[in-house]
């Protein structure tokens, strides 16, 4: 910030002293009805907010840049700046300017940052807004990471033994701000992912102070009560979070929920790369919303339910027991349309109880926040009724009945699930709070507390009296006038008012100069009249003139008392918010399953996987169910690694993703898009799909691909599920084949356990491993050819594809005809040696211990040398000569029968003992 070169006024001296305490924040300085910014802050704010930049100074040679915004609109402008990543310090007037002497006292009342905002304008309704803290361990490879959603009070932490995994988790949780110790240098990619780093002094990460902060915030005496005993890195990170929160909120964080250390041994681990590749939260182009898995699954009715859905998508279970509890609850709503509909209608009246409670607890709740909370509490009885009342709309069709499984606690689909029973045991209708808010607040209160008009009549006797004065003051004055007229007998007694004397009685001098009663006090003499007051009139005048201010002051006090009372109920509110979130989550999964005719999957502890008529939920939602081709897929002890081949655009990537997504959905407790499914639990889900590069870090597409693949090979366990798509692109063909081959070898060895892999490739050389390497099998996406055109059938069939049809796809994409024709000629020339090349590669790189058939002279030919021409079958020549358009249906049938006989009689045909290898190569997916 530039230093002023003029003699500063007391106001600017005060401004500069406050600015010195918040050098990294834009200081909004309250002056009357505006918040003003000066110097560099003003120039930046004017540019970002597109408001007028002016100046303020008595010295024209040293103008002070200045801009300002009205106090009543400050939240809108602050929200824009926070959304752009700026820190904002709000400096308010902390005393009444009317009663102050000299400079009005001002102080910073809050600091708003991207990771600590509470205003709805800066928050996504159904997504968390995380503040993160990372603490590296004494061992360079260790570290702890904690994250906190200030708006809800939820916070968690995790530690890792490897920095790479730690940073993967940071990128996965994507905090708006990340607190790190001074001098710590994170990976460059973190800076490119939109994560703002905030460097704090090392003292904020001190273990002793951090432990004291955390234990005090949670109200416990030992770290073991929080699962943090011996986990110093997480404790330090949590301490830094609390210190930063106290600094920005100007108070200790009393609204935090119990800390949850995330036990990864109980969760399906999905890293940030896999989330992106599966388009769980964002599409590959980075956009959210339509086209993502979350968008398909989100039938939640409340913000809390939406955020729980987000949590479960990030951290599904890997244990059968909690999954089945969710499945039972989901199915209970799935089969009962009437109950589910009633619950959805009731939940529609529930607002964001978590965030409302937080704002109220931190003294930032507006009157309208209280109304939203009141309406939410008022909806709880309707929610409860929807859960307990019997319904008659149960629909159980054979295709919707759950797969019989010993892992379920239900017998007939009607029994109340255990999870719901336990939920209802802790149900708190909060009738006392609902009645209090209902009796206290008007339905449409003003947005600002100090404006008054917040409370209903009957809530407070003194307030009612002041309201009566404010609303009926004129009537009281007229009643007093009438009483005095009657008492004094002066029928023409008048009541008047001026700014000098206030209210007065006026008596005509000519008519009543000698009849004025003794209790009249003379205030003013005029030529034709006398003006008087009385003690009663003075008292009434004082009450009338002060009633408005007294009413506003009393309402402010009453509102603060009400706020404190509701803040004291924050644990009850948070508990009910969690119950509502779970109900909403269950009904949302049931609604999605019902609308799309999904099934309940069976769960196993082995590595098997069987999916019947599986579909990709997002693709199906985009193109319509009628246009989506479902597929069966199976993995078992003999089929662990699937080599998937087929043309471009045939749907290989869709098949890969849909298998992974079905496993993910199952471990969330959701129904799955299939006719039936039995799935072995997965501990880690890995995906390497699609092309990407990172030019900012000098990383090519191939480099990024290899880095992600290396991570998968290092971190995968025997219970993981891996989907790999087109490994080895971006380099020479031989390099790509060699790398892909070696990876298949490595994964095949691990597949002797329970590791499951789907490997899509255009390197058809790899398909030779089927039958030669245990666990490896091939499948392909079928197509149909007719008159030189290809039709994508999108059907998964056994065996390898014979070619990739890349030239045909290029033609469909609009590549000019001459280029396509030339490509066909070159391809035909290359393919003459294709079979020879494939066998030569297999012979050259066969795995130790794998017995390959002995190769004859033809198989020893160079890889790209064409094979000698073979004699054509007579049927081929007949096929060339025929004119199909000239044949009648009967002639065509006769011709086909003749060809069949000729084919069977020709030596060397499949029916006459053609070699098994050639017969296998003849089986492709085109029809």
Swiss-Prot record:
Basic and acidic residues bias locations: 915-927
GO biological process, one term: mismatch repair
Protein keywords: ATP-binding, DNA damage, DNA repair, DNA-binding, Nucleotide-binding
Gene3D superfamilies named among the record's database cross-references: 1.10.1420.10, 6.10.140.430, DNA repair protein MutS, domain I, MutS, connector domain, P-loop containing nucleotide triphosphate hydrolases
UniProt KW Nuclease keyword: no
Binding-site residues for ATP, renumbered to this chain: 646-653
GO molecular function ontology, one term from the record: mismatched DNA binding
Source organism, top-level taxon: Bacteria
GO cellular component: cytosol
Family annotation (SUPFAM superfamilies): DNA repair protein MutS, domain I, DNA repair protein MutS, domain II, DNA repair protein MutS, domain III, P-loop containing nucleoside triphosphate hydrolases
Region Disordered: start-end pairs: 904-927
NCBIfam families found in the cross-reference section: mutS1, PRK05399.1
Function comment: This protein is involved in the repair of mismatches in DNA. It is possible that it carries out the mismatch recognition step. This protein has a weak ATPase activity.
Entry protein name: DNA mismatch repair protein MutS
Annotated source species: Desulfovibrio desulfuricans (strain ATCC 27774 / DSM 6949 / MB)
Phylogenetic classification of the source organism: Bacteria, Pseudomonadati, Thermodesulfobacteriota, Desulfovibrionia, Desulfovibrionales
Gene name in the database record: mutS
């Amino acid at each position: 910030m530039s230093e002023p070169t003029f003699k500063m006024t007391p106001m600017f001296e005060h401004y500069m002293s406050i600015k010195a305490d918040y050098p990294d924040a834009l200081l909004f300085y309250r002056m009357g009805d505006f918040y003003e910014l000066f110097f560099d802050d003003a120039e930046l704010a004017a540019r970002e907010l597109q408001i007028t930049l002016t100046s303020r100074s008595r010295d024209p040679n040293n103008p002070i840049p200045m801009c300002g915004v009205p106090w009543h609109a400050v939240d809108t402008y602050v929200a824009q700046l926070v959304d752009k990543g700026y820190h904002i310090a709000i400096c308010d007037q902390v005393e009444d300017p009317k009663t102050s002497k000299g400079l009005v006292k001002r102080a910073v009342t809050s600091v708003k940052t991207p990771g600590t905002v509470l205003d709805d304008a800066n928050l996504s309704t159904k997504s968390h807004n995380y503040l993160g803290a990372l603490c590296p361990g004494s061992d360079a490879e260790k570290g702890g990471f904690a994250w906190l959603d200030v708006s809800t009070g939820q916070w968690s932490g995790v530690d890792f033994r490897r920095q790479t995994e730690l940073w993967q988790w940071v990128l996965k949780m994507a905090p708006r701000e990340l607190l790190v110790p001074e001098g710590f240098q994170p990976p460059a990619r973190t800076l490119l992912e939109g994560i703002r780093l905030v460097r704090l002094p090392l003292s904020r990460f001190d273990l002793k102070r951090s432990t004291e902060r955390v234990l005090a915030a949670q109200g416990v005496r030992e770290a073991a009560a929080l699962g943090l005993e011996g986990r110093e890195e997480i404790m330090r990170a949590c301490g830094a979070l609390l210190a930063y929160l106290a600094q920005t909120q100007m108070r200790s964080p009393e609204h935090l929920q119990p800390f949850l250390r995330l036990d990864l041994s109980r969760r399906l681990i999905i890293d940030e790369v896999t989330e992106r590749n599966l388009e769980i939260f964002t599409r590959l182009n980075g956009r959210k919303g339509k086209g993502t898995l979350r968008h398909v699954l989100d039938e939640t009715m409340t913000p809390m339910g939406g955020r729980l859905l987000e949590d479960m998508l990030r951290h599904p279970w890997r244990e059968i027991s909690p999954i089945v509890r969710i499945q039972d609850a989901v199915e209970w709503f799935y089969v009962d349309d009437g109950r589910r509909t009633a619950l959805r209608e009731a939940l529609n009246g529930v607002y964001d109880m978590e965030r409302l409670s937080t704002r109220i607890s931190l003294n930032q709740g507006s009157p309208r926040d209280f109304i939203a909370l009141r309406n939410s509490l008022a909806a709880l009885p309707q929610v409860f009724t929807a859960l307990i009342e019997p319904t008659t709309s149960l629909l159980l069709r054979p295709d919707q009945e759950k797969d019989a499984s010993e892992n379920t606690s239900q017998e007939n689909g009607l029994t109340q699930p255990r999870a719901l029973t336990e939920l209802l045991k802790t149900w708190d209708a909060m009738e006392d709070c609902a009645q209090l808010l209902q009796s206290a607040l008007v339905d449409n209160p003003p947005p600002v507390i100090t404006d008054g008009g917040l409370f209903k009549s009957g809530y407070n006797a003194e307030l009612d009296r002041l309201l009566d004065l404010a609303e009926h003051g004129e009537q009281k004055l007229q009643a007093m006038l009438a009483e005095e007229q009657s008492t004094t007998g002066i029928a023409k007694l008048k009541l008047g008012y001026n700014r000098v004397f206030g209210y007065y009685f006026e008596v005509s001098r000519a008519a009543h100069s000698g009849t004025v009663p003794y209790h009249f006090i003379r205030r003013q003499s005029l030529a034709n009249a006398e003006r008087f007051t009385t003690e009663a009139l003075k008292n009434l005048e004082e009450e009338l003139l002060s009633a408005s201010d007294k009413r506003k002051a009393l309402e402010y006090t009453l509102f603060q008392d009400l706020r404190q009372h509701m803040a004291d109920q924050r644990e009850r509110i948070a508990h009910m918010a969690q119950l509502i979130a779970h109900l909403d989550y269950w009904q949302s999964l049931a609604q999605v399953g019902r609308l799309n005719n999904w099934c309940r999957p069976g769960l196993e502890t082995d590595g098997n996987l069987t999916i019947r008529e599986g579909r990709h939920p997002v693709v199906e939602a985009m193109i319509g169910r009628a246009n989506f081709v479902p597929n069966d897929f199976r993995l078992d002890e003999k089929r662990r690694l699937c080599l998937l081949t087929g043309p471009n655009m045939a749907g290989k990537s869709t098949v890969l993703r849909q298998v992974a997504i079905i496993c993910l959905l199952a471990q969330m407790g959701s129904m799955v898009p299939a006719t039936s499914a039995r799935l072995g639990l997965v501990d880690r889900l890995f995906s390497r799909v699609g092309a990407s590069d990172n030019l900012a870090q000098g990383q090519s597409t191939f480099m990024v691909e290899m880095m992600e693949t290396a991570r998968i090979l290092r971190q995968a366990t025997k219970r993981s599920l891996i989907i790999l798509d087109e490994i080895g692109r971006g380099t020479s063909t031989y390099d790509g084949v060699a790398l892909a081959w070696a990876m298949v070898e490595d994964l095949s060895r691990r597949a002797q356990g329970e590791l499951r892999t789907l490997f899509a490739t255009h390197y058809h050389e790899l398909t030779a491993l089927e039958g030669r390497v245990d666990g490896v099998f091939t499948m392909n996406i079928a197509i149909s050819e007719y008159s030189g055109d290809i039709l994508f059938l999108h059907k998964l069939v056994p065996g390898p594809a014979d070619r990739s049809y890349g030239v045909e796809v290029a033609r469909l994409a609009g590549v000019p005809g001459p280029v396509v024709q030339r490509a066909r000629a070159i391809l035909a020339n290359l393919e003459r040696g294709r079979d020879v090349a494939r066998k030569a590669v297999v012979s050259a790189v066969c795995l130790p211990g794998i017995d390959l058939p002995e190769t004859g002279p033809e198989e020893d030919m160079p890889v790209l040398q064409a094979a000698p021409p073979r004699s054509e079958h007579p049927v081929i020549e007949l096929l060339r000569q025929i004119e199909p358009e000239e044949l009648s249906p009967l002639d065509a049938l006769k011709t086909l029968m003749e060809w069949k006989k000729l084919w069977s009689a020709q030596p060397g045909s499949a029916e006459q003992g053609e070699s098994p290898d050639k017969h296998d190569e003849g089986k492709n997916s085109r029809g």
